[in-house]
C-alpha cells in the first residue's frame, strides 16, 4: 500500500469510527476527508497510479456521494443497531476503496445498492440520475417466483422453452444458491418470500452484453438457455413479450382504469383490484365510478396483491367508505425511533419539486417554496432544535391539509358512506409478499376493522420516507421511522393473513387463483 493510499485509509477509518458530537462538526469532517481524497488524487510518479488517479478524479462526485449516503444513513435510519452499524461501517470502507477507481457506471450504481442493503430497510431505493442514459440492460426473457420456486414468466418469440418451465440452475449453479451468492447483497427487504421475489426481479437487469446461462426443467429434462443483457432500459417497455396469461384475464371485467379494475365474479360477488394508492383524486373516482357498481354485490373482494403502494391515507379512506366507520381512528399502528424529521422532509419536498413528481399538486408546491428553499440550506445538516422542528412541521402539515383539501376529503367520505350505505357487505382482502408500503398499512387497517385477509404476509416495507439528492445526481430513498402494529415491528415481517395461501407454478400456468377459489368455496 502506498503512502497516499495508507493516508486515505487512515482518514476513511477516522470518518467511520470517531464518535460525532454534533452534526456541524460531522459535516466539517466529511468535507475534510473529501479534501484529503482530492489532494491525494495526483501524487504518484508512476504511470499506473496516474491512470488510476485519472479515474479517481472522474469519480470524485461518486466518492463524495457515497460519503453523503453513509452520513444520511447514520443520521436518519431508524434501523441501526450495533450489528448493523458495524456491518455498515465495514461495507462503507470496502466500497469507498472500490468506487475510487471504478470506471463501470453499472458497478458504481451497485455500490450504492450494496450500502443501502446493509441496513435491512425494505423501503429504501437508489435511483439513477434523472435525464441520463442509464447503464441498465435487460434480458429477452423474464423469470418470476412462486412458492419457493422460480419459473419462466415471459420471453421473446424466438425462445422455444415453454412458459412456466421451472428454473433450476443459473450459470450451472443451483438457482437459490446463485441468487444468495450474487444477488442478495443488493436486496434490502428481508421478509420471507418478498426477499426471494426481489432477488429474481433484480437478476433481470445488469450491464450491457453481460451473458448468463439459465437451465430449465422441461419434460423432466434439463434444457439450457444462454442469454445476453441486451435490451436498454429505455426500450424495455416497448418490447412485446410472450407472457403467461393472468388469471384476471378470464374474469368478467366491468370497469378498468389506472387505479382500479372491477370484476363481476358471480351473482352478488365483486372483485375490486386496487392497482395503487397514489393520488387523492382516486377517492373521487371510487365514490363516483366504483361504488355504484358495488351496490348489488353482497360480497366484496379487495385485491391488493399487485398494488404498488404510495399513500396510506387513500387506503384508509376506501375502507372508511366501505365499512361506514368514517370516524374511526387506528391507535394500534404507531411509529418508533422516528429520527430527526425536518431536514429529510424539507429535502424531500425539494426533490419532489426538482424531479416533478406528481404526488403534490403544482399550486401547492409553489406555495411551499419558502420551505423548499429552506431545504437547500438544510442539506448541510444545520439542524434545528426539536421544538423548532415540531413547530415548522406543524406549519407544513397545516399547509398541506389546507391546500390539498383534506377536510373536504373527510366530508366526501362521510357523504359517500351515508349515501350508499354499503357497510353491511362482507369484505375480504387478498394480500401478497409483493405488496408493501401503503399495502402494509392497509392490511393493518383491515385487521383493526376485522376484515379477513387471505394470501401471504405483506412485503414488510412501510413508513414515512425521505428522498435525498446526492452530489452525483443519484436520488436515495430512506425510511425515517419504524412502523409498529400492536407493538410488533412491520419491517421485514409484514402483516400475516388470516388464511395463508400462495400460488404455485401450476396455479399460474393454469390461470388458477387459489385465493379466489377459497372464497367462493367457503362463503
Each predicted region: which residue ranges?
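Bacterial N-terminal signal peptides that target proteins for export
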Residues: 24-31
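Gram-negative bacterial Sec-dependent N-terminal signal peptides
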Residues: 33-36
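Conserved acidic, small-residue-rich alpha-beta core segments centered on
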Residues: 311-509
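Flexible, low-complexity junctional segments that flank or bridge functional domains
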Residues: 44-337, 342-355, 426, 441, ...
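Cationic, low-complexity basic patches in intrinsically disordered or flexible, solvent-exposed regions
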Residues: 5-6
Amino acid at each position: 500500500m502506498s503512502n497516499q493510499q495508507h493516508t486515505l485509509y487512515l482518514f476513511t477509518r477516522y470518518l467511520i469510527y470517531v464518535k460525532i458530537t454534533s452534526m456541524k462538526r460531522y459535516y466539517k469532517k466529511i468535507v475534510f476527508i473529501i479534501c484529503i481524497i482530492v489532494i491525494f488524487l495526483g501524487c504518484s510518479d508512476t504511470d499506473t497510479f496516474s491512470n488510476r488517479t485519472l479515474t479517481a478524479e472522474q469519480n470524485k462526485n461518486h466518492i463524495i456521494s457515497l460519503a453523503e449516503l453513509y452520513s444520511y444513513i447514520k443520521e436518519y435510519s431508524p434501523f441501526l443497531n450495533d450489528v448493523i452499524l458495524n456491518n455498515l461501517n465495514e461495507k462503507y470502507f470496502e466500497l469507498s476503496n472500490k468506487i475510487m477507481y471504478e470506471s463501470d457506471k453499472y458497478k458504481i450504481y451497485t455500490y450504492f445498492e450494496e450500502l443501502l442493503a446493509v441496513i435491512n430497510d425494505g423501503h429504501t431505493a437508489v435511483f439513477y440520475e434523472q435525464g441520463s442514459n442509464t447503464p441498465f440492460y435487460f434480458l429477452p426473457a423474464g423469470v418470476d417466483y412462486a412458492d419457493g420456486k422460480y419459473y419462466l414468466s415471459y420471453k421473446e418469440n424466438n425462445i422455444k422453452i415453454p412458459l412456466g418451465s421451472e428454473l433450476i440452475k443459473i450459470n450451472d449453479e443451483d438457482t437459490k444458491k446463485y441468487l444468495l451468492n450474487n444477488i442478495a447483497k443488493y436486496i434490502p427487504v428481508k421478509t420471507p418470500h418478498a426477499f426471494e421475489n426481489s432477488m429474481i426481479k433484480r437478476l433481470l437487469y445488469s450491464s450491457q452484453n453481460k451473458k448468463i446461462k439459465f437451465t430449465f426443467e422441461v419434460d423432466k429434462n434439463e434444457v439450457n438457455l444462454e442469454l445476453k443483457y441486451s435490451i436498454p432500459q429505455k426500450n424495455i417497455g416497448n418490447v412485446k413479450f410472450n407472457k403467461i396469461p393472468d388469471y384476471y384475464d378470464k374474469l368478467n371485467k366491468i370497469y378498468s382504469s389506472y387505479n382500479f379494475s372491477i370484476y363481476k365474479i358471480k351473482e352478488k360477488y365483486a372483485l375490486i383490484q386496487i392497482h395503487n394508492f397514489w393520488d387523492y383524486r382516486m377517492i373521487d373516482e371510487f365514490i363516483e365510478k366504483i361504488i355504484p357498481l358495488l351496490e348489488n354485490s353482497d360480497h366484496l373482494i379487495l385485491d391488493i396483491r399487485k398494488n404498488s403502494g404510495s399513500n396510506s391515507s387513500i387506503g384508509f379512506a376506501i375502507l372508511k367508505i366501505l365499512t361506514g366507520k368514517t370516524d374511526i381512528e387506528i391507535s394500534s399502528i404507531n411509529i418508533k425511533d422516528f429520527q430527526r424529521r425536518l431536514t429529510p422532509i424539507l429535502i424531500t419536498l425539494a426533490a419532489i419539486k426538482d424531479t416533478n413528481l406528481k404526488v403534490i399538486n403544482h399550486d401547492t408546491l409553489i406555495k411551499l417554496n419558502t420551505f423548499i428553499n429552506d431545504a437547500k440550506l438544510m442539506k448541510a445538516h444545520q439542524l434545528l432544535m426539536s421544538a423548532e422542528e415540531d413547530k415548522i412541521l406543524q406549519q407544513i402539515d397545516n399547509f398541506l391539509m389546507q391546500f390539498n383539501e383534506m377536510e373536504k376529503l373527510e366530508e366526501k367520505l362521510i357523504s359517500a358512506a351515508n349515501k350508499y350505505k354499503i357497510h353491511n357487505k362482507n369484505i375480504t382482502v387478498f394480500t401478497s409478499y409483493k405488496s408493501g408500503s401503503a399495502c402494509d398499512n392497509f392490511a393493518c387497517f383491515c385487521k383493526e376493522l376485522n376484515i379477513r385477509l387471505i394470501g401471504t404476509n405483506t412485503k414488510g416495507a412501510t413508513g414515512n420516507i425521505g428522498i435525498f439528492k446526492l452530489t452525483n445526481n443519484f436520488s436515495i430513498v430512506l425510511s425515517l421511522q419504524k412502523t409498529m402494529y400492536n407493538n410488533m415491528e412491520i419491517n421485514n415481517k409484514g402483516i400475516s393473513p388470516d388464511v395463508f395461501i400462495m400460488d404455485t407454478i401450476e396455479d399460474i400456468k393454469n390461470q388458477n387463483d387459489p385465493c379466489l377459489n377459497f372464497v367462493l368455496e367457503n362463503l
